[in-house]
A protein has these predicted regions:
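Active-site-proximal helices and loops of the catalytic beta/alpha 8
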Residues: 119, 152, 160, 165-180, ...
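Conserved structured core elements
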Residues: 6, 91, 109-116, 236-243, ...
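Short, acidic/polar
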Residues: 33-49, 231-251
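N-terminal structural segment of carbohydrate-active enzymes
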Residues: 1-128, 136-137, 143-147, 157-159
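Short glycine/proline-rich turn/loop motifs
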Residues: 17-30, 94-102, 205-234, 238-239, ...
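Aromatic- and acidic-residue-enriched segments that line the glycan-binding/catalytic groove
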Residues: 65-94, 135-211
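Active-site beta-loop-alpha junctions enriched in small/polar residues
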Residues: 15, 62, 134-138, 262-264, ...
């Protein structure tokens, strides 16, 4: 995009932005502490941001992520609490890339519509929408129930008998159960994963520690972590699936993606995916969270 001008981004977490509980309870539930809602981000709020000089609003925590709150009555898969950090969970442990987090909806059954209305309000106030894109990892119990018809889920056709295959979406520690150093519960409450999948922070064994991202699973972009070999032809399944996710949200009116932990995903994917998205949405902007300065200009 040319002549974009100066961008001023305001990060806004709907869950926290409009919360009204004056005395929140430490480690409290949503029933105790409440949660802000997308509908509460009204034109008054948005106009005030615009008047401050803000050009883009980065809405954090929109995409459905692991949580200890039970929404199974709405057809949402319940997360095992032992692979959720905190009651609210992390907005970077995605459980369904094609859905909206129910905590921030007034009417859970209309959560996507409420997001679409938020996008419309934001645009009507002269602002752009930034959404998180988390390409490196997903929640351990990732399962998309809201994916469009014909879309194949991550890991759906993986060969779990192989540690690495370019056709797999995950890495599997074959013959080993997931055995982190943190408590995984007992009996019916126990979290069981076999074979163990590699953990999000490049932990390629079955025993991540409490400081690892043990609640997440690393995505496989066609790189064998043991020897660094790259298998990008034909295009890996993960590339196509993640690009489809970008296109889905761009079609919802998202103007920019704040891309999480960019350096943990092959540069080649970014060149390919950005070009694919811009074929249909040439004005979409990609913003990188990047900690490897060696690939800054890649």
């Amino acid at each position: 995009m040319n002549n974009i001008g100066k961008i001023i981004i305001y990060q806004l977490c709907p869950r926290l932005f409009t919360i009204t509980q004056p005395n929140p309870v430490f480690n409290g539930t949503i029933a105790q502490n409440g949660a802000g809602k997308m509908n509460q981000i009204d034109t008054r709020v948005l106009n005030s941001l615009r008047d401050m000089g803000v050009t883009h609003v980065w809405y954090t925590g929109i995409v459905q992520h692991a949580s200890k709150t039970d929404y199974s009555a709405y057809g949402i898969h319940k997360s095992n609490p032992h692979v959720v950090k905190g009651n609210a969970g992390s907005p970077y442990a995605i459980t369904d890339y094609y859905d909206v987090d129910p905590d921030i909806a007034v009417d859970v059954s209309q959560r996507m519509k409420e997001f679409e209305q938020l996008v419309q309000r934001t645009h009507a106030c002269g602002l752009k929408v930034v959404l998180d894109f988390v390409p490196n990892h997903v929640a351990r119990q990732y399962r998309s129930l809201a994916k469009p018809k014909g879309v194949e889920d991550l890991g759906q056709t993986d060969d779990k008998g192989m540690f690495f295959s370019p056709n797999n979406n995950f890495y599997y520690i074959t013959g080993k159960p997931f055995s982190p150093s943190v408590d995984m519960g007992e009996g019916d409450d126990k979290y069981v994963e076999y074979p163990a999948k590699a953990t999000g922070n490049d932990c390629f064994h079955e025993c991540p520690g409490g400081n690892d991202w043990f609640e997440t699973v690393k995505l496989n972009y066609g790189v064998d972590p043991w020897n660094g070999s790259k298998h990008f032809s034909p295009i890996p399944s993960t590339w196509t699936k993640m690009c489809d996710i970008l296109l889905f949200w761009a079609a919802k009116g998202v103007d920019a993606f704040r891309c999480d932990m960019v350096h943990m995903v092959p540069v080649e994917f970014w060149h390919w995916a950005i070009a694919k998205v811009k074929e249909q949405y040439p004005d979409v902007v990609f913003i990188a969270e990047l900690y490897d300065v060696g690939i800054y200009h890649s």
